[in-house]
Amino acid sequence: MSTLERIDPEIADVICEEEKRQRGKLELIASENFVSEAVREAQGSVLTNKYAEGYPGKRYYGGCEFVDMAERLAQERAKKLFDAEYANVQPHSGSQANMAIFFAVLQPGDTVLGMDLRQGGHLTHGSPVSFSGKLYNVVSYGVRKDTEQIDFDQVARLAREHRPKLIIAGASAYPRIIDFARFGQIAKEIAAYLMVDMAHIAGLVCSGLHPSPVPHADFVTSTTHKTLRGPRGGLILSHSNYTRLLDSQIFPGIQGGPLMHVIAAKAVAFREALQPSFKEYQQRVVADAAALAQELKALGYRLVSGGTDNHLMLVDLTPQGVTGRVAEETLDKAGITVNKNSIPFDQQKPQVTSGIRIGTPALATRGILPHHMKAVAGFMHRGLKSAGDEPALARLRAEVAEFCSAFPLFS
């Protein structure tokens, strides 16, 4: 019996059941992944006990000599990984990294140009329910109806018309390569700051499988999980002339003590991402996504923009007469985890949606390869066709669990 089982059997049971879920189901949520045992070990270490307000060498607490070493390693590895002059590894999340940029260069009421949430953007890019939409004047761009790819003519027109102080590039549900150089040109034309949120594609960027935003943006933010396959957390990259401005916005601006156990885990993840094997992993992620997209199209599914260039795709279920919410619930019963997602120009409410977003980072981590995507697409197709048929879904769930057992986790 473990210490946790003895002290708190209820939480121990929750963790046990969640591990079973992760082992036995196909994880197709594009923003989820499985960290290495080394990352988990660092995050569960004694570093969780240490307060360390401030930055290495400039702390407000004593006894920080070793956590200073951990944070410096994380900073240097992040800079090397993305060829950046500056890295702040303290943000607790991608949203807080974004908030720090807003607070650093904007005043309440300033104009921001960001991607519409319902066309692929993120809550923190100007949604009215987010701080970004509540404190600032937000103008939103989207995608073209014919290609379902970013409408750069619209971006340029809105930029010239509204003269935003900050332009945001990056997305949470966009399956194509983003032209950061073009965003940079538009921002320079109107003397705006450019912030790129690369949370979803950071792993692809550091592996050379997606163009880097670092040369074109004033600020780059990211999460450290998703394709980067680290602990849940945030990251800011920038140029050295912004060091004091950005450091002060994270602490004491919006955060107090950093999570040193998470920062150590970030350092481990960055070291893993610097290895040649990580690029090979990212190549599998992209190859898996391309193969899965092809198999789904062969089964009659319409993909937003016609396919994918990265790790994710959006499936429009309108032709199948199924909502995203029903698809998410049905596939979960079949042992397949996805999330409902709005598609461009969606007529359904955000709680319902016409589509699902799926991705392959977690599949590739398990060792599931492109030639397995025919089976994965087949499982999805059978699940969606079995909506409401509980016995059929139960049988399919058993098949999916058997399939997953060939690709063990946490070995």
Curated annotation (Swiss-Prot):
Gene expressing this chain: glyA
GO terms assigned for molecular function: glycine hydroxymethyltransferase activity; pyridoxal phosphate binding
User: Mind telling me which NCBIfam families this protein's record contains?
Assistant: PRK00011.1
Binding residue positions for (6S)-5,6,7,8-tetrahydrofolate: 117, 121-123
GO terms, biological process = glycine biosynthetic process from serine; tetrahydrofolate interconversion
- Organism for this UniProt entry: Syntrophobacter fumaroxidans (strain DSM 10017 / MPOB)
What's the subunit arrangement here?
Homodimer.
UniProt cross-references to InterPro entries, sorted A to Z: PyrdxlP-dep_Trfase, PyrdxlP-dep_Trfase_major, PyrdxlP-dep_Trfase_small, Ser_HO-MeTrfase, Ser_HO-MeTrfase-like, Ser_HO-MeTrfase_PLP_BS, SHMT-like_dom
Has UniProt tagged this entry with the keyword Protease?
A: no
Q: Tell me, in a sentence or two, what this protein's role is.
A: Catalyzes the reversible interconversion of serine and glycine with tetrahydrofolate (THF) serving as the one-carbon carrier. This reaction serves as the major source of one-carbon groups required for the biosynthesis of purines, thymidylate, methionine, and other important biomolecules. Also exhibits THF-independent aldolase activity toward beta-hydroxyamino acids, producing glycine and aldehydes, via a retro-aldol mechanism.
State the pathway, as annotated in the record.
Answer: One-carbon metabolism; tetrahydrofolate interconversion; Amino-acid biosynthesis; glycine biosynthesis; glycine from L-serine: step 1/1
List where this protein forms a coiled coil: none
Q: Record's Gene Ontology CC terms?
A: cytosol
Organism lineage reads as: Bacteria, Pseudomonadati, Thermodesulfobacteriota, Syntrophobacteria, Syntrophobacterales
Q: Which residues carry this modification: N6-(pyridoxal phosphate)lysine?
A: 226
What broad class of enzyme is this? transferase
> Family assignment?
Belongs to the SHMT family.
Names of the cofactor(s): pyridoxal 5'-phosphate
Q: What Gene3D superfamilies does the annotation carry? A: Aspartate Aminotransferase, domain 1, Type I PLP-dependent aspartate aminotransferase-like (Major domain)
UniProt-annotated location(s)? Cytoplasm
Residues the UniProt record annotates as site (Plays an important role in substrate specificity)? 225
**One Pfam family of this protein, by short name?**
SHMT
Q: What is this protein called?
A: Serine hydroxymethyltransferase
Transmembrane region(s): none
Return the EC number: 2.1.2.1
Q: Which UniProt keywords apply?
A: Amino-acid biosynthesis, Cytoplasm, One-carbon metabolism, Pyridoxal phosphate, Transferase
Reaction it catalyzes: (6R)-5,10-methylene-5,6,7,8-tetrahydrofolate + glycine + H2O = (6S)-5,6,7,8-tetrahydrofolate + L-serine
